[in-house]
Amino acid sequence: MARYRLHCVGASGNSFKVALFLNCAGIDWEPIGVDFAGGETRDAVWRAEVNEMGEIPVLEVDGRRLSQSGAILSWLAETHGVFGPSNAEEGFETARWLLFDNHKFTGSFAAHRVLQSMTPAPTHPDVLAYMRSRVQSAFSIVDKHLADRRFMLGNRPTIVDFSLVGYLYYPVEETGFDLAAAFPAIDASRARIAALSGWKPPYEMMPVGNSLPVVRSATEGLRA
């Protein structure tokens, strides 16, 4: 059995952030599929035994169960000495961007993806428009930051990049965003991450499992 066991599902970009680090760092790990759509993470026993917060990813290591992707990435970088900040200034920038990612970048993009493609009934257009505006605002900030950089902190990939790209490899039919057309600097950085040894698409890296199904495809008119 691998030292690291990741409770995850293929549709979870937050889980992909951790899986991507493990693969690119050459660390042996195994995925543990979660019945997300079936309510496993809401089960009282699962919460008592795996994660009281009722969320994935959860990384099992040496009898511990670590949760929250940003915290896990920080722990992995410090533990293994790769993809982390190299000095105090980078440490501050890492924390700053991880918080921004969780609150604005991934937070809005992942929510829009669910509302766009995975709710049982179509989401009201006004709600979708509001969420799209939040995505566009957050992505514009990162796209501008990356305009003269290869990666978020300079010329090498770090956990900031792994965190930000968590949901960026899902198909446009799910997300409704054509990143290459709308955010070229983000798209270029995303391609650099995909060129790293160990990278795989999320649905290949993690078990598809029982996640929220894609019930609608984004149309050309909804792409940005």
What are these regions (language model features)?
Residues 53, 79, 148-149, 196:
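Structured helix-beta-strand junction loops
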Residues 36-37, 157, 208-209:
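Positions that flank functional sites
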Residues 1-129, 219-221:
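GST-like domain detector, emphasizing the conserved glutathione-binding G-site
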Residues 22, 198-199:
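Short beta-strand edge/turn micro-motifs at domain boundaries
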